[in-house]
Amino acid sequence: MKLPRIDFLVCSIFLVIAAPAWSGQAELALEEGLRLHEAGKPKEAIREYDKAIKADPKLAEAYFNRGNAYYDLGQNEQAVRDYSEVIRLSAKDAEAYFNRGNAYRRLKKDDLALKDFSAAIKLEPKDAKNYINRGSIHFGARRYEAALKDFGEALGLNPKDAETFYNRANSYLALDKKEDAIKDYGEALSLDPSLVDAYYNRGIAYADSAQYENAIRDFDEVLVRNPKSSNAFYNRALSKAKIDRYEAAVEDYSDAMRLNPKDPEAPFNRGRAYLRLGKFDHAARDFSEVIVTQPRNAEAFIYRGIARIYQGKDKEADADFQKAFQLNPAIKKNVQPIIDEAKAKAKASPTGKPLGRTPEQ
């Protein structure tokens, strides 16, 4: 069985801009820099922050806001330097640790980012965003239990945050705690019905729990909002096939292929649906398409061989089976009885009748 695809929502990145709190020339430059920055002109703002720093080299707010401007421009090394200067001048500035952590994340220095978010939590233990961003690092490192704990802390501080429910649900799903994941996706959707990825991943959780009708409904919701989601068509097709809705599954696999023609999994599974429908010519074509892109896919040779049995092409079928056994000798023991059964059924029944067993059963 091919694995479903899961989408993950990246945790929100928060930045904080400090308000000016100094007087004189430095204050004027800082105020002008802040005005320009808020007007979407970070380059011009940096020049004003430079003036403020020149007037007062110990003005932490100027370094902080210049760091934010560099961050907005994607100049993350410079942002780190400015946030580090803020921390040197004011070691208890939680927001400087937080923002430097975000810059480190962009630089793919997650270990340093983790330390900074932890420092921010120590200084501001009641600020949910610190836990959210640390949780996202844990999640990215597959430390799912730690991610659960951090997202839980964030929800304790802000129980109305839909994205945090979503991200905790993803952590539950990664730990195969599907019931908890489904519950959290539901909470996320009750707070923000526009979270299309929550419908999608809840659909995955439902499908993995053999709740295929619920899964189909969630994939329906995804496709209402994003009719070009090839993954939603693909996974909805998988669920439809599980409840013997093969014609409908074929339609969804076809839409998935139309939207993502280079994906070999949709034609593979559409071929299996065609087999169940007794459309052996169509099935053989799909498995042939898979073999073109995946010439070492033993399963595709097995399935095409079964289709060819029902087409009356025994010689070609046997060649497919031998190729499959050459690629993966271990599968012969399991599939040989199915091959023998298919040959017997093909002789006893007219071509075009639905199959009995197939290798996935």
Named regions from a protein language model:
Residues 3, 26-28, 310, 315-361:
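Terminal, low-structured helical/coil segments at or just beyond the last alpha-helical repeat
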Residues 19-43, 47-48, 65, 343, ...:
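N-terminal leader/linker segments that initiate helical-solenoid repeat arrays
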Residues 30-38, 61-72, 95-106, 129-140, ...:
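Conserved alpha-helical positions within TPR/SEL1-like repeat arrays
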